[in-house]
């Protein structure tokens, strides 16, 4: 996709993180920077947390002269163009530059793509604060939200507030191994261009995803607003006119591939919430599937869960959250379907019921010390709702928490969620 206008500078892109999903995103982005050299610098920096790796004997990169001697992961990626530890068997574009220095990797980059475990966000931001371009913009590929008794916060805003930049979010029914193998899938990118950027090349905005949109003028005060529509405390620096506009068209060209279709929306909160709440619903789907109730029961759980996801978003983020983000986008219903069909939360919940043990016991047996995202999110969301006296308004989310704590059984689910039939229809 060619951008007209003859801009003096191109956007440099850095991927912050190099795990399974981070390397997959780097592959996509590097393919597109190479295809859109009028907009982006071709080389893509990828920050790699340096570690020693040993190349397996059955790998095509195995060197008998080195044998089992450990090698630096960055060296291996740059030499063989493969992340042999986190994305083995997938050839990465040669314009990906693995960099062990976080500060050096982000230097002079106008687009930062974050893809790392959420518990490392604050440390990473502390390391690069004041060392990035002040007008840089970001995309968070970190699924989920942070929920505490105090409130719900978005990881994209953790990053944005920490670095004084604007950050959107990417989420969807995206299994990294399938995308890396170039099996077709969709994703949703939520990016609500700050008014000072949007005034250059306004991005159409609408109440729902899709191509038919209505342009709205940016606020006269050019004040950036957060995901709840409030004036943000973060003061942003406009993207200089020497660069192509960082709008929906630009990010679409950076992420869209023939095998990875991108839908652009403005609802950052909705996209982020979808990636978190679907894990709780997936546990419920696993419970009823493990009980042997079949596809009808699983479909009922998904329908009720989807309604509660929309309600949660509307109740705690207001009109910035759009129903269509949940009902029409990959970040909503598609990710929910994938998670309730074979995701890790679904599988562990199903096994717990089939074996007559707790989900916690399945975690200990099968996950090598890791924890399910669904269980922690279920506890956090329930605590948040209970602190506000709202747990009865979300019967499915509340039922999952009760089952996890042993206060209810799977057999109770139909009666626990029956009052959803009396609730108001989706707006």
Curated annotation (Swiss-Prot):
InterPro entries: 6-PGluconate_DH-like_C_sf, 6PGD_dom2, G3P_DH_NAD-dep, G3P_DH_NAD-dep_C, G3P_DH_NAD-dep_N, NAD(P)-bd_dom_sf. It catalyses: sn-glycerol 3-phosphate + NAD(+) = dihydroxyacetone phosphate + NADH + H(+). SUPFAM superfamilies: 6-phosphogluconate dehydrogenase C-terminal domain-like, NAD(P)-binding Rossmann-fold domains. It comes from Hypocrea atroviridis. NAD(+) binds at residues 17-22, 49, 120, 176, 344, 373. The lineage of its organism: Eukaryota, Fungi, Dikarya, Ascomycota, Pezizomycotina. Its EC number is 1.1.1.8. One of its GO terms (biological process) is glycerol-3-phosphate catabolic process. It is an enzyme of class 1 (oxidoreductase). The keyword NAD applies. Substrate binds at residues 143, 344-345. Residues 200-215 have a biased composition (Polar residues). The active site is at residue 278. GO terms for molecular function: glycerol-3-phosphate dehydrogenase (NAD+) activity; NAD binding. This is Glycerol-3-phosphate dehydrogenase [NAD(+)]. GO terms for cellular component: cytosol; nucleus. Residues 192-238 are annotated as: Disordered. Keywords: NAD, Oxidoreductase. Belongs to the NAD-dependent glycerol-3-phosphate dehydrogenase family.
């Amino acid at each position: 996709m060619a951008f007209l206008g003859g801009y003096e500078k191109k956007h440099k892109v850095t991927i912050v993180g190099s795990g399974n999903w981070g390397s997959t995103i780097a592959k996509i982005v590097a393919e597109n920077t190479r295809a859109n050299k009028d907009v982006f610098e071709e080389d893509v920096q990828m920050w790699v947390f340096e570690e020693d790796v040993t190349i397996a004997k059955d790998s095509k990169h195995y060197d008998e002269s080195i044998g089992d001697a450990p090698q630096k992961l960055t060296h291996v990626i740059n030499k063989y163009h493969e992340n042999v530890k986190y994305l083995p068997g997938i050839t990465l574009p040669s314009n990906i530059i693995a960099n062990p220095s976080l500060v050096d990797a982000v230097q002079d980059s106008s687009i930062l793509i974050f893809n790392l475990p959420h518990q490392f966000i604050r440390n990473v931001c502390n390391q690069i604060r004041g060392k990035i371009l002040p007008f840089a913009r970001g995309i968070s590929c970190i699924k989920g939200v942070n929920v505490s008794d105090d409130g719900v916060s978005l990881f994209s805003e953790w990053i944005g507030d920490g670095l004084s930049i604007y950050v959107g979010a990417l989420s969807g029914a995206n299994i990294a191994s399938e995308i890396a193998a170039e099996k077709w899938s969709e994703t949703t990118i939520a990016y609500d261009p700050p008014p000072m950027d949007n005034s250059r090349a306004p991005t159409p905005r609408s109440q729902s995803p899709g191509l038919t949109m209505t342009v709205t003028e940016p606020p006269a005060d050019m004040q950036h607003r957060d995901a709840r529509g409030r004036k943000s405390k973060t003061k942003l620096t406009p993207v200089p006119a020497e660069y192509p506009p960082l709008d929906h068209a630009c990010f679409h060209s950076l992420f869209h591939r023939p095998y990875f279709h991108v839908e652009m929306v403005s609802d950052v909160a909705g996209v982020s919430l979808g990636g978190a709440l679907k894990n709780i619903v997936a546990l419920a789907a696993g419970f009823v599937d493990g009980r042997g109730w079949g596809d009808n029961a699983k479909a009922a759980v998904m329908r009720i869960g989807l309604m509660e996801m929309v309600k949660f978003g509307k109740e705690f983020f207001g009109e910035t959250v759009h129903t269509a983000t949940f009902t029409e986008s990959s970040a909503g219903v598609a990710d929910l379907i994938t998670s309730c069909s074979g995701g890790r939360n679904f599988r562990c919940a199903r096994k717990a019921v089939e074996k007559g043990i707790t989900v916690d016991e399945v975690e200990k047996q099968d996950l090598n010390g890791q924890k399910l995202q669904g269980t922690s999110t279920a506890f956090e969301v329930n605590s948040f709702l209970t602190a506000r006296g709202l747990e009865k308004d979300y019967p499915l989310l509340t039922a999952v928490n009760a089952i996890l704590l042993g206060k209810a059984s799977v057999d109770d689910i139909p009666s626990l969620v029956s009052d959803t039939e009396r609730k108001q229809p989706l707006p």
